[in-house]
Amino acid sequence: MAVQKRLFLLDAYALIFRGYYALIKNPRVNSKGQDTSAIMGFVNSLFDVIKREKPDHLAVAFDKGGSSERVEMYEDYKANRDETPEAIRIAVPIIQEILKAMHVPCIEIEGVEADDLIGTLAKQAEKEDYQVFMVTPDKDYAQLVSENIFMYKPARMGNGIEIWGIPEVQKRFEVER
């Protein structure tokens, strides 16, 4: 039997926010005084995945314009969220340029959130016999885990990476299949 190809799909904003807030008490600042914590955190996560996992395929999904469909269904969708910090807003185009220079595909569709893109791509790739790893700290992705779709939670605060398959999701959320 042929070895399954492995596709890694990264949730850009989940990793960018995580990188930024991980260093909130001791931000990384460049010579121009710009907070580069979000950039450093994201790039470190990306490089760790590439070095550790050597994926066959890799892509990064970005939110673009929020979920118009969800706002139509529920007017207050994400209405209580704080405004995105300026350092993150500045970091996003820089991260996209880094990804472009590395020839890493960036996926975004107006009015569609990254988690919906990743979920759709993961299910499509699974049908094509890929093993899919959704790289994110966001537990909401657990609902997508299947025989060939896994959550890949990057290392944080001295803990190693976590890969959640069906048994890990069942244990974590105390659910049965």
What are these regions (language model features)?
Residues 2-4, 25-29, 79-177:
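Extended two-metal-dependent nuclease catalytic cores across DNA- and RNA-processing enzymes
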Residues 1-59, 69-73:
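Non-catalytic, usually N-terminal nucleic-acid engagement modules in DNA/RNA processing proteins
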Residues 8, 59-62, 134, 153:
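Structural beta-sheet core signal
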Residues 11, 56, 63, 115-116, ...:
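Acidic side chains
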Residues 76:
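Arg/Lys-rich, often Gly-containing low-complexity segments of ribosomal proteins
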